[in-house]
Amino acid sequence: MEDIMQLPKARVNASMLPQYIDRPVCFVGKLEKIHPTGKMFILSDGEGKNGTIELMEPLDEEISGIVEVVGKVTAKATVLCASYTLFKEDTNRFDLELYNEAVKIINELPQFFPVGLPQHE
């Protein structure tokens, strides 16, 4: 299987996860909860809906705030994390609601934003 980091990834919110099963995605959300095992956490998107992120290994660092996750959507509509990035909010606040609006537009107009979608000629 090709490395997921090399594949095009659709930007999605929590409601869109069931449409992307077995496909690579990028999910951005606010950390709500970390499972006690450290192998799963919950992110809320710009609509306040939750997405579950699964990890291969337990977290080895403290995470908080806004997190961008790249991974593959599982059959349970969770994201199996390949990598994550913490957004630093020291100087600028990340507007998750505005980001969510952009994600919806990108998905509503695939002819203008084709990244992560199969191309049909």
UniProtKB/Swiss-Prot annotation:
Superkingdom: Eukaryota
Bridged cysteine pairs (disulfide): none
One GO cellular component term: DNA replication factor A complex
Pfam families in the record: Rep_fac-A_3
UniProt keywords, alphabetically: DNA damage, DNA recombination, DNA repair, DNA replication, Isopeptide bond, Nucleus, Ubl conjugation
Principal location listed in the UniProt entry: nucleus
Keyword Repeat among record annotations: no
Molecular functions per Gene Ontology: damaged DNA binding; single-stranded DNA binding
Modified how: Ubiquitinated by RFWD3 at stalled replication forks in response to DNA damage: ubiquitination by RFWD3 does not lead to degradation by the proteasome and promotes removal of the RPA complex from stalled replication forks, promoting homologous recombination.
GO biological process: base-excision repair; DNA replication; double-strand break repair via homologous recombination; mismatch repair; nucleotide-excision repair; regulation of cell population proliferation; regulation of mitotic cell cycle
Localization annotation: Nucleus
Cross-link type Glycyl lysine isopeptide (Lys-Gly) (interchain with G-Cter in ubiquitin), residue numbers: K39, K88
Similarity comment: family membership: Belongs to the replication factor A protein 3 family.
Function of the protein: As part of the heterotrimeric replication protein A complex (RPA/RP-A), binds and stabilizes single-stranded DNA intermediates, that form during DNA replication or upon DNA stress. It prevents their reannealing and in parallel, recruits and activates different proteins and complexes involved in DNA metabolism. Thereby, it plays an essential role both in DNA replication and the cellular response to DNA damage. In the cellular response to DNA damage, the RPA complex controls DNA repair and DNA damage checkpoint activation.
Assembly, per entry: Component of the canonical replication protein A complex (RPA), a heterotrimer composed of RPA1, RPA2 and RPA3. Also a component of the aRPA, the alternative replication protein A complex, a trimeric complex similar to the replication protein A complex/RPA but where RPA1 and RPA3 are associated with RPA4 instead of RPA2.
The protein's name: Replication protein A 14 kDa subunit
